[in-house]
């Protein structure tokens, strides 16, 4: 009855009129984060210079084959001015969670959306990328044209975007769109 997906992909469904007009609800933002193998030293990535040094010191770096990984590969390394220096030690992980490969010891550092990193055992979540280097994926939902229960679908989306659902959404590594933003920067 509802679809929940990356906002850009949902826009395509809306354009094709496969969702009920006006039913789109912005739900959550998904930032990129980093993990290390459980028990490994936890590096500092809290600032842009610290992230840069961490990447330069690492023996191996993994990133996903999704949008977050494409960002790491095509933009993050370049923004940090280290794309040439990390090229040979940075690897795209296809079709499986990056954190699972870090947990096995195949890579020192792993980058993916935080919500994909947190549930994987055997790793330590280091943190999100610094704000200046962050890449956010927005998730949204809408009621489908073929919904058997469109009113219940609208109610579900309303609940998922409410303050009552915010703590559960936050626990998964997502940032609810309904959450207050820190504007003091």
Which residues fall in each region the model found?
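Exported/periplasmic ABC-transporter solute-binding proteins
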Residues: 1, 6-16, 20-21, 25-30, ...
């Amino acid at each position: 009855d509802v679809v929940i997906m990356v906002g850009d992909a949902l826009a395509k469904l809306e354009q094709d009129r496969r969702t009920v007009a006006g039913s789109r609800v912005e739900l959550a933002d998904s930032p990129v984060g980093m993990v290390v193998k459980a028990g490994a030293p936890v590096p500092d990535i809290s600032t842009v210079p610290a992230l840069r040094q961490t990447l330069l010191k690492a023996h191996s770096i993994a990133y996903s084959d999704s949008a977050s990984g494409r960002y790491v590969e095509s933009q993050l390394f370049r923004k940090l001015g280290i794309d040439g220096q990390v090229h040979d030690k940075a690897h795209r992980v296809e079709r499986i969670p990056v954190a699972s490969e870090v947990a096995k010891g195949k890579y020192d550092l792993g980058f993916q959306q935080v919500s994909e990193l947190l549930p994987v055992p055997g790793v330590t979540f280091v943190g999100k990328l610094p704000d200046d280097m962050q890449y956010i994926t927005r998730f949204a939902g809408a009621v489908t044209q073929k919904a058997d229960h469109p009113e219940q679908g609208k109610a579900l989306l309303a609940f998922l975007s409410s303050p009552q659902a915010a703590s559960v959404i936050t626990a998964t590594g997502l940032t609810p769109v309904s959450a207050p933003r820190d504007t003091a920067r």
